[in-house]
């Protein structure tokens, strides 16, 4: 499943989806037109969608998330390891959600004002500095399942988020040379996403083929 970034929607992940489909992967939209919904509400909706897809496909899913999408992916992986076998984050400041450019901070303030003015369904001040923000932060610090495959792609040329905030210690870190907004369409980033998913495929096949007494040793090597 592909989750777009802050103030972006499913169309921004279309190029990534098309590439993955050409390579034989089945992709699913997050069903987000504009990613401005309260973080907790967005997470709950995504969790419901994950459950629906995982039940239909009878298998765990991998999430590829851009920016805020990657942060949502990490939260989902912490809550529902039964649904998720891997995540790939692209320019996602999971270690410090506030480590963003002031322009993005202004956008967040605008959403808060619109919410106070009566436009419902969007992020409020609580999402940036209240209980919602606190709960999201605590969730981002939850230890992940050791069997979860996690790749964090970051760029020192990001320009929007502090690249150091993207280096989740639970992830394998991959550096690229692109802008924040270019993450979802950059060919090099796409290659790294594809490589991460193929690695997951190979590991899944190895676990499925291995005798029961060898499965645990395979997991130890992976982690």
Task: Label each PLM-derived region with a short phrase.
Residues 1-11, 15, 21-139, 222:
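Serine-dependent carboxylesterase/thioesterase catalytic core
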Residues 17-18, 169:
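Short, solvent-exposed amphipathic alpha-helical segments in soluble enzyme
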Residues 78-79, 83-223:
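Helical cap/lid subdomain of alpha/beta-hydrolase-fold lipid enzymes
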